[in-house]
A protein has these predicted regions:
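Extended alpha-helical scaffolding segments
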Residues: 1-10, 30-180
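Short metal-coordination and nucleic-acid-contact micro-motifs, chiefly zinc-binding Cys/His arrays
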Residues: 15-21
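Short Cys/His-rich metal-coordination motifs, predominantly Zn2+-binding knuckles/fingers
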Residues: 26-28
Length: 180
């Protein structure tokens, strides 16, 4: 809107340096992260890293807010999610799969054997144990016949996140939450 009265009203109600705000991740009041750390390891994204949350043009600003204030995430939460994703997306991670153009990561909210079995089912078998994938799938198929659950834990939450390249940003392709 270009009306002067609206511009003045918005300017008065918004501070340029909104140091604190409500974090969209935790819901708690926290110092808002202006620029989020880069996430590396997403196939097809820039090798120097890319962001899930970023605003690089003034056209993306809303209600007079700039950069991170448009999607407020606390400094602690921004550090936590980017550090966790960088770890999950690292080359040596067994919790990372490539599904089409989506770099897919998965984890449980507490230690669970499913984290290893999930990778065994969907990834290429290791050269030193080419039958590992077959054993993991066999265990899943034999469990109902034997009358036991392959993993006896329906309280542990399990997360699957698919990330895809989108110019200088990272797009969330899919997000699934279930139980082990």
């Amino acid at each position: 809107c270009q009306r002067q009265a609206v511009i003045e009203a918005v300017s008065k109600s918004v501070t340029k340096e909104a140091a604190n705000g409500f974090c969209l991740i935790t819901g708690d009041s926290d110092e808002v992260e202006r620029l989020h750390p880069a996430i590396k390891g997403v196939w097809g994204a820039q090798t120097s890293g890319a962001n899930i949350i970023s605003f690089n043009l003034s056209a993306f600003n809303s209600w007079g807010k700039e950069q991170g204030a448009n999607a407020p995430v606390g400094k602690h939460s921004a550090f936590a999610y980017t550090t966790a994703l960088n770890s999950l997306l690292s080359k040596d991670s067994r919790q990372r799969l490539q599904i089409g153009d989506a770099s897919t990561v998965f984890w449980a909210d507490k230690p669970s054997p499913l984290e290893d079995q999930f990778a065994d089912i969907f990834s290429d078998p290791p050269k030193d144990d080419p039958d590992r994938n077959a054993r993991a799938i066999k265990a899943l198929y034999e469990a109902p016949r034997q009358g036991v659950a392959p993993i006896k834990d329906n309280q542990t939450r399990f997360f699957v996140l698919g990330l895809g390249p989108n110019a200088a940003r990272i797009a969330i392709r899919f997000w699934h939450v279930g139980t082990v």
